[in-house]
Amino acid sequence: MNQVFKGWSRGMSTSRGRSMRSKVESRMRKESGKTLREIRRAKKLKKKLMTDEERLIYNLKRAKKKVALLLQKLKKYDLPELPSPVHDPELFTSEQVQAFKKIGFKNKNYVPVGVRGVFGGVVQNMHMHWKFHETVQVCCDNFPKEKIKEMASMIARLSGGVVINIHNVKTIIMFRGRNYRQPKNLIPVNTLTKRKALFKARFEQALESQKLNIKKTEQQLRRMGVNPEDPVAMASIHRVASTFFNAIDKKEGTPYVFHGDKQSERGTSVDNREESEPGDEDSDQEELDRFIAEIEEAADKEWEEEEAAEQEESGRIRYWNREEFAGRSRTPELRSYGDASHGFRRNDRDTHSQRRPNDSDDDDDDGELDSEDDEIPKRFDRARSSNTNTRRPREDFKRRSPDPRPRPRAQVRSDDDVLSDLDNTMWDSEDEEDAPPANYISSSDDDEDENRTVSASSSKQSRFRNNSSRDGINNSKSKSGKQRDEDWDSD
């Protein structure tokens, strides 16, 4: 086992007595390669070994690079200013301005301007307010005082309104004009979309923060005695800082470790670099040009990606219905009404299940709803058949069932349905006790029925009148309670 983990134990163990300089030297010798991975690790190690002045200078250069990149990105969002529309200048007297100002304070309608600034949506909302009001309040609470007048002039140019007053520094009262007519396109042509306005606001916010960061870093450098605007001082700091890294690149050792044989060589290399400073100016110019080209390329690439994302989002919003239903559009009203109709029928079945007779199943309600239209012609057919004297002898002895259609086959039901049937039978038994007894027809009423059929056949009136007369005879021939008891006993 010791032989197996021998290599691992050597790799994980560290020798005692090694100083920090020896560790840095060995690490820098390993990081002197030219591969991408080694270059990244070398840059990371450079940051760790920087002094305070070097770190501040590095942060200052990095912040200036970010500012250049943000300025290049913001150039993409600059829109050409269209010529202002030609209209009659509206001149107001002081009394008219005061009257419109009073109207603007009285009307509480307002349009907020958020982090996106003034874009097409703000102008559209103003036109929607001007449809019913003469004035509108534009609230610019997220912007500094210096930008309010600039925003007021921009809003007046895009909307065609008149600035009446700037109230409490952050609220602009806009008047629509005397001869105002709502334009056909509420969103002006030379305005940003909602998405692009948000990206522009983010870049402007990042630019302001980078400017503050640069100002703070320059103040810290001045406190240390270094003038950030002095090119000579900056060049000397860069020269001192680059001696260490140039020595590593040329594998001449490090300035932290003394090498007697290579000390003179290192001194001569520094002299050669001082002599070759004029040639370095050209390399700096080439590096600057390359940096500008990289910034422009990165800005163009990001703009193209943003345009593609915006087109994809607009297409998704426009055709979301087709994507969801695979090309078949279905309105939400139909979906809601369909679900509601099923729920209504289900609830109606549950509420009426307690009042049904015992011999009807739970699944018969749907059939009863469908068979309501079929019961009307059956009644008329029964009236026609009564004209002919072909009656079955024991037809009147049968109990009249509320549902004339045949009963379906018994289905297998779960335990819950069986329990619900037991509850229904209990309810029905109580209802039968409270309800009046049913009306039965006995054999003693055959003569009366024959007389009714003869009178019905002799009359030449309409079918509707026959039905009404038969109902009247049935109501007049109602039996007493004693006769119904006798009929029950005879059955």
From Swiss-Prot:
Biased composition (Basic and acidic residues): 22-34, 255-265, 345-359, 392-416
Protein name: CRM-domain containing factor CFM9, mitochondrial
Gene knockout outcome: Delayed seed germination, retarded growth and reduced size and height.
GO biological process: Group II intron splicing; mitochondrial polycistronic RNA processing; mRNA processing; response to abscisic acid; response to salt stress; response to water deprivation
Disordered: region residues: 1-34, 255-287, 328-491
Entries under InterPro entries matching the protein: At3g25440-like, RNA-binding_CRM, YhbY-like_sf
Entry keyword Mitochondrion: yes
Annotated localization: Mitochondrion
Alphabetized Pfam families for the sequence: CRS1_YhbY (PF01985)
Key words, A-Z: Mitochondrion, mRNA processing, mRNA splicing, Ribonucleoprotein, RNA-binding, Transit peptide
Source organism per UniProt: Arabidopsis thaliana
Residue spans of biased composition, Polar residues class: 453-478
Targeting signal (transit peptide) range: 1-25
SMART domains according to UniProt: CRS1_YhbY
Ranges of residues in domain CRM: 90-187
